[in-house]
Amino acid sequence: MAGKKVLIVYAHQEPKSFNGSLKNVAVDELSRQGCTVTVSDLYAMNLEPRATDKDITGTLSNPEVFNYGVETHEAYKQRSLASDITDEQKKVREADLVIFQFPLYWFSVPAILKGWMDRVLCQGFAFDIPGFYDSGLLQGKLALLSVTTGGTAEMYTKTGVNGDSRYFLWPLQHGTLHFCGFKVLAPQISFAPEIASEEERKGMVAAWSQRLQTIWKEEPIPCTAHWHFGQ
């Protein structure tokens, strides 16, 4: 939709990967719609994933006992966070939709993306106390997880060996994105692209592109325990 701003947070080492193809088609389709699309390519940026005292450029409030959450909250208020954090916060602040494109690692995100979440979504910027879940500071924004898996779709069902795919999404969709106030759109899961045929992979990319054509008409999921775990 013309005038909308989209941030794609992309976490894959290889530009020619299937994840890279999904990222590229999202850039192409959303740009075609007139959206302004920004990509944070975390590996290309060599993003620091570790949450350390180097994230604070000013004086620590308690240099004797370091508490990352307390210090980054204070640094956010004092505008003394490291520039790589504030650069990403600016991108999030300006975005109407944030898409996270990544391969599933151990039922979660790659370490570099976890580091992005740990460092960028700090108290004062993404949430506060009070000021979380429906009152989170990023309310009014949309978020979407576009995930690739190693296992097949059958493995990620209630009777499959890995359980329903919604189970592993709970900490990310509810505990991170919803906690920060995002309205969460249904995930885009591309199952087992490495063992899929070329025709099947093309179908996954085409399905993602087609979905993006009407993404602005979608309603967010009810980000509740019942949605993730209900029968």
Curated annotation (Swiss-Prot):
A single GO molecular function term of this UniProt record: resveratrol binding
Regulation: Inhibited by melatonin, resveratrol and 5-hydroxytryptamine.
Enzyme Commission number: 1.10.5.1
Residues noted as binding Zn(2+) in the record, renumbered to the chain: H174, H178, C223
Residues annotated with Phosphoserine modification: S80, S197
Keyword Cell division belongs to the record: no
Cofactor(s) it depends on: Zn(2+); FAD
GO cellular component, one term: cytosol
Subcellular location: Cytoplasm
The keyword Cytoplasm is annotated on this UniProt entry: yes
Catalytic activity: 1-(beta-D-ribofuranosyl)-1,4-dihydronicotinamide + a quinone + H(+) = beta-nicotinamide D-riboside + a quinol
Keyword terms: Cytoplasm, FAD, Flavoprotein, Metal-binding, Oxidoreductase, Phosphoprotein, Zinc
Cofactor note: Binds 1 zinc ion per subunit.
Source taxon at top rank: Eukaryota
Chain positions recorded as FAD binding sites: 12, 18-21, 104-107, 148-151, 156, 194, 201
Listed GO biological process terms: quinone catabolic process
Amino-acid positions noted as binding substrate in the UniProt annotation, renumbered to this chain: F127, D128, I129
Note: Uses dihydronicotinamide riboside (NRH) rather than NAD(P)H as an electron donor.
Assembly and oligomerization: Homodimer.
Known role: The enzyme apparently serves as a quinone reductase in connection with conjugation reactions of hydroquinones involved in detoxification pathways as well as in biosynthetic processes such as the vitamin K-dependent gamma-carboxylation of glutamate residues in prothrombin synthesis.
Family that this chain belongs to: Belongs to the NAD(P)H dehydrogenase (quinone) family.
Name the record gives this protein: Ribosyldihydronicotinamide dehydrogenase [quinone]
